[in-house]
From Swiss-Prot:
InterPro entries: CCT_CS, TIFY/JAZ, Tify_dom. GO terms for cellular component: nucleus. This is Protein TIFY 3B. Interacts with MYC2, AFPH2/NINJA, TIFY10A/JAZ1, TIFY10B/JAZ2, TIFY11A/JAZ5, TIFY11B/JAZ6, TIFY5A/JAZ8 and TIFY9/JAZ10. (Microbial infection) Interacts with the pathogenic Pseudomonas syringae HopZ1a protein. Pfam families: Jas_motif, tify. It comes from Arabidopsis thaliana.
Length: 187
């Protein structure tokens, strides 16, 4: 966070006062006079001024907008942060809740003797999440897409080299009982 510090300024009566580069004061036109030079004002304010706490500035990013608050006491800022943290905890605890099946969401029947509390007694009732058909079938769709891709890639490789190349040399031909016709059948 950037703090903006106001520079002390000398008051000017009836004209325009301009500070030159070395910190002195100069008067442009008019009949007024500069009450104090800027150097005098700075030195007296530094000696007499107590270290004051600059006003707190709070910047909030919410809903796509930026809001800046100046001069908030630190107690209010801490309270706002506590409220925001509590809201985030509540939001996270409800969003992490497990998805339950419809059978678990049924209210207990009147003939039931179990001591399980009804869903209405829960502080945050579990809402069943409805999935779109495309969202629910997404892993299967990915699998089918991958399978189609691999088939097309295999077809491209086969079309590029339709016949397997043999790296056999004449010395690699077996000399045993196996004939060449059995090892490399034609047709």
């Amino acid at each position: 966070m950037t703090k903006v510090k106001d520079e002390p300024r000398a008051s000017v009566e009836g004209g325009c006062g301009v500070a030159d580069g070395d910190g002195g004061a100069a008067e442009i036109g008019g009949t007024g006079s500069v009450e104090k030079s800027i150097n005098e004002v700075r030195s007296t304010e530094i000696q007499t001024a107590e270290p004051t706490v600059p006003p707190n500035q709070l910047t909030i990013f919410f809903g796509g907008s930026v809001t800046v608050f100046d001069g908030l006491p630190s107690e209010k800022v801490q309270e706002i942060l506590r409220i925001a943290a509590k809201a985030m905890e509540t939001k996270n605890s409800t969003s992490i809740s497990p998805v339950s099946s419809p059978a678990l969401n049924r209210a207990p029947s009147f003939s039931s003797t179990s001591n399980v509390a009804s869903p209405a007694a829960q502080p945050f009732p579990i809402q069943p999440i409805s999935f779109c058909r495309s969202t629910a079938d997404l892993p299967i769709a990915r699998r089918h897409s991958l399978q189609r891709f691999l088939e097309k890639r295999r077809d491209r490789l086969v079309n590029k080299n339709p016949y397997p190349t043999s790296d056999f040399k004449k010395t690699d031909v077996p000399t045993g009982n196996v004939s060449i016709k059995e090892e490399f059948p034609t047709a």
